[in-house]
Amino acid sequence: MTNIHNHKILILDFGSQYTQLIARRVREIGVYCELWAWDVTEEQIREFNPTGIILSGGPESTTEENSPRAPEYVFNAGVPVLGICYGMQTMAMQLGGLTETSDHREFGYASVELKATDSLFAKLNDDLTACNPKLDVWMSHGDKVTRLPSNFQITGVTPTCPIAAMSDESRRFYGVQFHPEVTHTKSGLALLTNFVVNICGCETKWTAENIIEDAVARIKAQVGDDEVILGLSGGVDSSVTALLLHRAIGKNLHCVFVDNGLLRLNEGDQVMEMFGDKFGLNIIRVNAEDRFLDALKGIDEPEAKRKTIGKVFVDVFDDESKKLTSVKWLAQGTIYPDVIESAASKTGKAHVIKSHHNVGGLPDYMKLGLVEPLRELFKDEVRKIGLALGLPAEMLNRHPFPGPGLGVRVLGEIKKEYCDLVRRADAIFMEELHASGWYYKVSQAFTVFLPVKSVGVMGDGRKYDWAVSLRAVETIDFMTAHWAHLPYDLLGKISNRIINEVNGISRVVYDVSGKPPATIEWE
């Protein structure tokens, strides 16, 4: 079996908003990597045994006395090191160079002129008309390196940054003041490939097929002939987890699908058809709509609704698990960003790996072992694996749907009537987005039920019914978002269909709020 962890890159995080993007780019190249906090110990680095190390950017200033520094062992480990932005600055400082606060800060696009050819910039050039090769890059820095460490050479400059890139080829140390991990840097992926593959010598074994083979083998080794229970929601993470487990242990996997009455139109039937009929998984469908809606009566505060939905799910799941007395393992669709977030929130350090209970926390008395086959993977990798396992692309690329479902898309108190109305309205919205070619042009779209009534006219009669809001946004990372400028004729068609086809809705509005100041979801 292919050892997909044999060659690996260690990324030390100094707090940049782009750090996870570095990891995703390295994985995209085909090499495994992990993201740890900057203050790891020598023992931890030795144990990980990286083939190369990348120092990320960060918001701090190396001119400050107590700013973060890379562990000294990083520069004594005998492996290549790439410093990006702050990572380059701390490399320079720690190896005897000097940094200063710049009079001319660089934020945004810049052109770096290459002054020397080294292994990092081999065959890179974005401007063939220039005397020296040039790269179109993305800068985001206020400090700059003003004096090189011994044995380093300047490899790149900009008009306001005399040392935009540097290298010591003998020790295989490299620094770039720009961000190769962002798509704005045109040859960024090629630069990272030069470092990871050509300089570090990593083999590109991190592929969907090899990841599946490795995951299946590890599941078999972990659980053996034991039985496993999984809460299957129909979302990407739990779906891919289910198929990996099914491939590894077959009928020893018991999937529990909880229909809470807060799902999209016909979603429960679609999940059963896909995983029960098509893939042959062992699925228990629990119709718990009444139980959820009863528990939610009188609750209108968003966080209280979320907590109630999470608690009822745990109770329902617990009831079903008690019926399966031979189950010894609980499977979860935890992915790598969950692991990073969980560790950081508990300790402030990304390298302390803790379990992330994405089902809201299970009772201690269940005493089940934990199986998390996706915990090393980013979301885009999970989708690629799902595709390789046979899941349809349209399912894997669906817009995000919140864990509480319609519980946070019905404003105020949740009632079955409201859920039914917003479900049907949203189905029309999605249908028209697909038909018009807009579904995959926007990052997320959904319908919100507004608990207000307004007067409308149908034929010769007046009606006094509910209102819904349509929401569509465009975003790269969901941290910020712009409202999508859908064509007026499309919005008009969607509105007319909803008002005419969904009895109980008399008004449709379109949300034109960006994030910030608004959030993407209303609750």
Swiss-Prot record:
Lineage: Bacteria, Pseudomonadati, Pseudomonadota, Gammaproteobacteria, Pasteurellales
PROSITE patterns assigned: GATASE_TYPE_1, GMPS_ATP_PPASE
PANTHER family: GMP SYNTHASE [GLUTAMINE-HYDROLYZING], GMP SYNTHASE-RELATED
Subunit description: Homodimer.
UniProt-listed Enzyme Commission number(s): 6.3.5.2
Gene responsible for this protein: guaA
Pfam families recorded: GATase, GMP_synt_C, NAD_synthase
Keywords: ATP-binding, Glutamine amidotransferase, GMP biosynthesis, Ligase, Nucleotide-binding, Purine biosynthesis
Domain GMPS ATP-PPase residues, every copy: 206-398
Domain of life: Bacteria
InterPro entries: Class_I_gatase-like, GATASE, GMP_synth_C, GMP_synth_GATase, GMP_synthase, GMPS_ATP_PPase_dom, NAD/GMP_synthase, Rossmann-like_a/b/a_fold
Binding site for ATP: S233, G234, G235, V236, D237, S238, S239
Function: Catalyzes the synthesis of GMP from XMP.
GO cellular component: cytosol
Active site: C85 (nucleophile), H179, E181
Protein name: GMP synthase [glutamine-hydrolyzing]
Keyword ATP-binding among record annotations: yes
Metabolic or biological pathway: Purine metabolism; GMP biosynthesis; GMP from XMP (L-Gln route): step 1/1
Organism the protein comes from: Glaesserella parasuis serovar 5 (strain SH0165)
Reaction(s) catalysed by this chain's protein: XMP + L-glutamine + ATP + H2O = GMP + L-glutamate + AMP + diphosphate + 2 H(+)
A molecular function (GO) term: ATP binding
